[in-house]
Design a protein with these regions (language model features):
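Non-heme Fe(II) oxygenase metal-center motifs and adjacent flexible, charged/small-residue loops
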Residues: 1-217
């Protein structure tokens, strides 16, 4: 996982040849990951998110205060845009500029009226999973999916590409098109128990959190 001093360089992997789907390894440092997790915890502190789902190991959607399953933001002035979306965009743009990649990296642009929603799903170790699916979000949006805590065994597949299976580590960000036209299938097949530095949140050793930021273009 990324460390708190940003000594591990970010790296971009193009997962699919036929659709926009990019994995950014080590996108967020441990300090940034902890900041995100602390904000999630603060915003859900008055809600009972500790109870296990009735059908273990079904993943649990974190419910925020006010009985909301998603956070909604307008503009860039929030920790999720600044640390996840902007960090990922900066890395993708740098990848194109420095390495002159022939693949067309797609990154969002933001204005003060940019709309963004954030949802968080918590997975149990080791059998937490999410069936393969297509998001079917047809509102001209892009997804930035951050993994926190224990790593996930993750699957992505495009309509014309081979299935890709990879270990989705804490601090990695997956950027992809969630539309029906893109038809990117993705899912979680299992969760790995990983080791973490002593200054990590205790929950990182018990769970995997999928933090999905959906940004309208």
């Amino acid at each position: 996982m990324s460390d708190s001093n940003n000594t591990t360089s970010a790296a971009v992997e193009v997962l699919l040849d036929d659709r926009p789907c990019y994995l950014i390894r080590n996108c967020l440092s441990l300090t940034q990951q902890t900041t995100i997790y602390q904000d999630i915890s603060h915003r859900s502190k008055d809600t009972d998110n500790q109870s296990k789902p009735c059908m273990h190991p079904t993943p649990k959607t974190i419910i925020f205060d006010g009985n909301q399953s998603t956070l909604k933001f307008s503009g860039r002035n929030n920790v999720y845009y600044e640390l996840i979306v902007q960090t990922a965009n900066d890395i993708l743009k740098k990848e194109v500029a420095l390495l002159q990649k022939s693949h067309s990296f797609f990154t969002t642009t933001s204005t003060d009226s940019t709309k963004m929603s954030v949802g968080v799903i918590r997975y149990q170790v080791p059998n937490g999973n999410f069936p393969n699916h297509i998001d079917h979000c047809n509102d001209n949006s892009f997804v930035y999916l951050l993994s926190l805590g224990c790593s996930a065994n993750f699957v992505v597949k495009g309509p014309e590409s081979e299935k890709q299976v990879f270990r989705f580590n804490s601090g990695d960000v997956l950027v992809f098109d969630p539309s029906s036209d893109a038809a990117i299938v993705h899912g979680v097949t299992g969760i790995n128990r990983d080791d973490f530095p002593s200054n990590s949140p205790n929950e990182f050793q018990q769970f995997r959190f999928g933090v999905q930021c959906r940004v309208k273009l």
